[in-house]
């Protein structure tokens, strides 16, 4: 456990926290593997002084748009299977606000899915969240454009686009003006993935509808159920009455990852960060390579494909994260009570043990150059930072990841995105491209497919924080680490004690953290 013991069946836990210095769209979700597919929701922080204080025109309405998955399989079993190298479970459909839309005929009747009713000329603030487990999505509305105004609860310079690219864990706030001819317009969410020879997985688009509120004659036309493939056009630009077939958008190709690369690269912060970045003081440098490896079920190194006992794992600098085998106290409480992690934790390597051509085509899994790399193993990866340290991390993707971009999420902090690129990171050339004026600020950053991203953050929130990939299969496979931020010089910059209603784990489940700590100290004497 990182921050707390699980909430047991038929039990409850009340969270108490302060919202300070944040506005915008966030979301909450479970952190038990697979469970967040259904246990999640929007968490919206509005300005203290109301919508009139937004740094953009006051919208007529605010609408959450949550993209997710529909599962017909046991999610707990899926998570267990992934730890056994079984990857056969996929979502049966995609959803917008919990509705699968008319691509799917689940009960013998096709339903139109989520409908956004709009009035001509009005402006709507869409609070878009990707709560899916596995896929980045492209979101488009036929005949309309978006103006992106925020990402991950941080305001951005207004950016006009006809497509939103959003990875698992990310949020995007976008203004939509109902300025098209009155009618019905499809809202389509299309998952993307890299093309062959990378691994192909089942992907399902879904759609809702933007419907103009107008007086029109009754319409008895049944909405046609049709399929969509990225890159096909569904009569975009056709203007008809509300009884005609709704207008569909021209979507990016399902194998297009470049549109996402440019979407994320065009985001800049509305608030300049020069006061933080002009000092050029970097206290900690990390170069983290994201990859895949193989271990035996017994923990030894195996050559992939040569044994039924080998297991594929996801890695950061060639080590795969694992929880301690018998944890009775979350790491957050251990940090507060100054309990040593010696013997249970390993420091996250600041650079990979071996440098190589990370984006070399032959490194595709099962390829001829795959195995000369360093052996992989599992450990509880931890990296400590002094309070107030300026930390720079470069995340480097590899060909081994089979074309996946990787949404890396850091709990408890925002990250300034300095630059991104394709191919291998170049320490000399790429530093010159850093945006040190107004880099976009996010809590989830998308490492491009076979590319890199450079971020900085200030370690000013004391505690124990999870850094992990927001693709569920990569997280379950071990693409994660723990960042520990030490106490600052004052009470306000130090970790507070665990709340009294926070129970311990295992056989000590009825003890408060303080009772458990005192009992442990007594047993040592």
State each model region's role.
Residues 253, 259-265, 272-275:
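Long, low-complexity intrinsically disordered regions
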Residues 51, 73, 195, 491:
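Surface-exposed, flexible loop/turn segments at secondary-structure boundaries
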Residues 1-3, 148-162, 168, 196-226, ...:
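Active-site pocket scaffolds in enzymes
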Residues 59-132, 232-234, 250, 266, ...:
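Acidic-aromatic/histidine active-site loop/patch
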Residues 54-56, 77, 494-497:
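Short, charged, solvent-exposed linker or helix-capping segments at domain edges/interfaces
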Residues 1-72, 111-143, 164-189, 272-294, ...:
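Beta-strand cores of secreted/periplasmic/IMS beta-sandwich domains, seen most often
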Residues 134-135, 194-196:
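Short beta-strands and strand-coil junctions in structured, solvent-facing domains, enriched
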């Amino acid at each position: 456990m990182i921050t707390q013991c699980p909430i047991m069946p038929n039990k409850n836990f009340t969270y108490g926290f302060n919202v300070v210095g944040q506005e915008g769209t966030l979301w909450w979700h479970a952190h038990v593997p697979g469970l967040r597919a259904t246990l999640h929701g929007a968490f919206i922080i509005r300005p203290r002084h109301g919508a009139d204080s937004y740094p953009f025109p006051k919208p007529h309405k605010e609408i959450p748009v949550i993209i997710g998955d529909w599962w017909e399989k046991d999610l707990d079993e899926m998570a267990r299977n992934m730890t056994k190298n079984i990857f056969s479970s996929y979502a049966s459909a995609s959803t917008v606000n919990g509705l699968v839309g008319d691509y799917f005929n689940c009960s013998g009747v096709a339903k139109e899915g989520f409908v956004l009713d709009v009035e001509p000329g009005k402006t709507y603030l869409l609070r878009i969240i990707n709560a899916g487990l596995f896929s980045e999505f492209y979101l488009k509305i036929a005949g309309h454009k978006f103006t992106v105004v925020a990402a991950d609860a941080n305001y951005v310079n207004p950016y006009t686009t006809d497509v939103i690219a959003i990875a698992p864990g990310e949020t995007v706030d976008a203004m939509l003006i109902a300025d098209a001819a009155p009618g019905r317009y499809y809202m389509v969410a299309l998952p993307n993935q890299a093309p062959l020879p990378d691994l192909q997985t089942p992907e399902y688009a879904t759609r809702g509808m933007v419907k103009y509120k107008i007086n029109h004659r009754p319409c008895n036309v049944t909405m046609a159920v049709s399929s969509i493939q990225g890159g096909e056009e569904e009569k975009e630009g056709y203007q008809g009455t509300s009884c005609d077939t709704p207008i569909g958008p021209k979507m990016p190709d399902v194998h297009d990852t470049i549109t996402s690369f440019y979407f994320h690269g065009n985001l800049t912060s509305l608030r300049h960060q020069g006061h933080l970045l002009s000092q050029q003081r970097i206290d900690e440098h990390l170069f983290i390579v994201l990859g895949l490896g193989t271990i035996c079920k017994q923990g030894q190194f195996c050559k992939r494909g040569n044994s039924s006992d080998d297991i594929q794992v996801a890695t950061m600098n060639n080590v795969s994260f694992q929880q301690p085998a018998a944890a009775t106290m979350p790491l957050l409480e251990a940090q507060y009570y100054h309990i040593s992690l010696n013997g249970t934790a390993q420091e996250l390597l600041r650079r990979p043990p071996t440098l190589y051509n990370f984006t070399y085509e032959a490194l595709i899994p099962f390829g001829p150059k795959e195995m000369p790399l360093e052996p992989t193993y599992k450990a509880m990866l931890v990296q400590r930072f002094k309070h107030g340290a300026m930390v720079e991390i470069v995340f480097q993707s590899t060909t081994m990841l089979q074309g996946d971009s990787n949404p890396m999420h850091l709990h408890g902090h925002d990250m300034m995105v300095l630059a991104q690129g394709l191919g291998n990171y170049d320490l000399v050339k790429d530093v010159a491209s850093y945006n040190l004026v107004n880099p976009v600020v996010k809590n989830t950053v998308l490492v491009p497919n076979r590319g890199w991203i450079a971020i900085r953050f200030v370690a000013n929130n004391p505690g124990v924080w999870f850094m992990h990939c927001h693709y569920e299969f990569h997280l379950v496979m071990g693409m994660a680490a723990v960042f520990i931020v030490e106490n600052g010089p004052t009470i306000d910059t130090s970790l507070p004690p665990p709340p009294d209603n926070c129970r311990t784990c295992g056989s000590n489940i009825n003890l408060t953290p303080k009772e458990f700590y005192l009992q442990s100290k007594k047993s040592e004497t």
